[in-house]
Amino acid sequence: MNSIPIYQVDAFSENLFSGNPAAICVIKEWLSDETMQSIALENNLSETAFVNISLKPFYIRWFTPESEMGLCGHATLASARILFDEYIDKNSSEIIFQANRGRLRAIKKGDLIYLDFPKDFPNPIANNEKIIDALRLKPKKLFKGIDDYLAILDTEEDVKNVELNFEKISELDARGLIISANGVNT
């Protein structure tokens, strides 16, 4: 295997050792899924992004140390920073990424980078016992998006006081569980 440039970027911060770290691997041809998974495991960061710069738009994939992810915001932001700084024309102000889920745009304005992600419109679903077990209460409304469940509780106070069962959350058929409620001032 040829050498692969790997960058570690702390997204959302200008200070060293702060922010949200991600590894960025810039490649010109795809590696096997097993190799990318092994690299992510060795990097041991929450996400490692693989950006294939030989494809237009640039194709991007994200791996945790355990598995491939469908989408990762901070690793996309970090990837855009590396590409703007090191790989594309300095006058460019936009990068289009192609991901398994669709296209993502990174727009550079001055020193800032803005991301435009595909929309996710969660659909209402019936309550189910797994969610109730994870929340230890019955949500007022429940929705399922592409990656996550969204549980709407009765009150803001319920959100503050919920005692989650993280073991049950890890058993859900989703990346995560988002909890919300109408606030007092809404």
Where are the predicted features?
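Active-site proximal loop and beta-alpha junction motif in alpha/beta enzyme cores
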Residues: 1-71, 77-186
